[in-house]
Amino acid sequence: MRKRLLCISILFSTFDSLYAGNSWIRINQLGYLPDAVKVAVLISEEDIRIGHFQLRNAITETVVYKGQTKEYDASGWGMKSAYRLDFSNFKNAGGYYIQIDDIKSPCFRIANDVYNGTADFILNYMRQQRCGYNPYLKDSCHLNDGIIVDHPTKTGREIDVTGGWHDASDYLQYLTTSANATYQMLFAYLHNPGAYGDNYNAKGHKGKNGIPDILDEAKWGLEWLDKMNPAYGEMYNQIADDRDHIGYRLPSKDTAGYGLGKHRPVYYITGKQQGLAKHKNRTTGVSSSAAKFASAFALGAQLIKEYYPVFANKIAKKAAEAYEFALSDLGVCQTACNVSPYFYEEENYVDDLELAACELHRLTNKKYYFDQAVKWGAVEPVTPWMSSGRARHYQFYPFVNLGHYYLSEKQSIYIDYLKDGLQFIYERCEKDPFLNGIPFIWCSNNLVVAALTQARCYYNATKDSTYIKMEAALRDWLFGCNPWGTSMICGLPAGGDYPQLPHSSITYLLNETTYGGLIDGPVDKTIYNNLRGIHLLKKDEYAPFQNGKAVYHDDMGDYSSNEPTMDGTASLSFYLSSMEKEGNRNK
């Protein structure tokens, strides 16, 4: 009998070891706030039955908590088993790991300070993306921007629009994403000023200048927007085009040619279809771009006035003028392409008008702007990708409507609008082990951040915890609680599993990651297989996890899932600063 029991024990031990090799426990590598929802996810290539899990002290290895598992459908991620492991009731600070038989998670922390410094950390990427003078490279680039194109009378003239940020790992610059990035950083500072330090000066070099670093970065964006809108009704939407896509090189060594000598083309906002070659966009008006100018100028004027009063007054005036111009030719203004059919396919503009009117109301307290905001806000109650679960590339942009949050303080119907958007996402995620109802389009991580932002705004406005578990799951997704077990932010957390080989010249030529950058994120297999020019450069370390609905590669050759973006990174500012604020509140 004893021998038989020993054999059974060895048999189960063998099974445990076998499962440990193809079963994984995914966690938020950054850690968990003590009072927050805390969940890990187990996925397995085997059909296994698990009822309980243990939380162990990382130093003593003693069991500090036992919890029950909850089974979910694993098939969507190409697995046979999936369980959610909820340990929210355990609130003691410290270092821990989760264990189920021989399956162990990485170690993680529970503490109120796990998000401290993260909102400042992502500004490293914004500084790295600066055009003109680049503090990361300590060098300058694109000092001859640019030559006007598509203007009825000024085509061929020089215009000084040096500055701003490169959009991603290419060196194009778009008003669309730059204005949104500027606004997002200002919005974060408006709501969570205590999360931001002063460790860099206005040029982006280390050293205090008496101004929070996030305002330094937003000011950098505002100065460029000011150049791109030199006079009433004269706005520019883009510098360069996809002729830029000629391979890896540092921005200071940019050799892309546009037939303009040392200059790059600067696209005038015409309100009509644009494209200097075969491929054209589908522009129908000026509203989406002009209103983005207005919202960034209006909020910027309020927040930088203490430090730059003259400039603040200048852009306050431009904000009102930009809104007036936005109403003059209703429609969307898309980015322009040249050698390929890829561009930002923005198709909504009423959200931009709503937000611009909100910020002008905040700036001026004029009833006209409030009435305008309500008018436009009622046209699009829910950002369309949230309700439909699909979108083309940047079809509904910005990905979150922050005008609704402003109006929710005045009219309860806008709280309903915020809730409706979250409910659509929630209904798509209920059966997913990672509670992720985001469509895996190109730049899916930007949608994750948008959903997180809306969830946090809704909770701030209502204290309704209906979506708090989904919010936690999406937050954890960005830090490693996903099928691949990787953080989606380069360099965060330190010592964790994060993108080491993003699609970037910084990585290719300098052998460094793009610290602070949020990568595009997992993309639907069908989209991935139909994109041009993707060639993996190494063996896929995540091969076991590519059999589900979406794929991700930490590979320089995959621009679809592993390229950091400037606007996505900036959009993280509000959420990360909110989490730091939450942790510090509970200390």
Task: Describe each region flagged by the PLM.
Residues 1-21:
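Bacterial Sec-dependent N-terminal signal peptides
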Residues 203-214:
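Acidic, glycine-anchored loop motifs typical of Ca2+
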Residues 272-282, 333-339, 382-386, 427-438:
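Acidic/His metal-coordination segments adjacent to aromatic residues that form catalytic metal sites
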Residues 25, 29-106, 112-113, 127-183, ...:
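Aromatic (Trp/Tyr) and acidic
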Residues 104-105, 112-125, 193, 208:
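Active-site-surrounding "flap" and adjacent substrate/cofactor-binding loops of secreted or lumenal enzymes
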Residues 286, 290, 294-304, 312-362, ...:
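Aromatic-lined, polymer-binding surfaces characteristic
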Residues 20-29, 122:
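Boundary/junction segments of secreted and surface-exposed precursor proteins
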Residues 214-239:
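Carboxylate/His-rich catalytic cores and anion/metal-binding grooves
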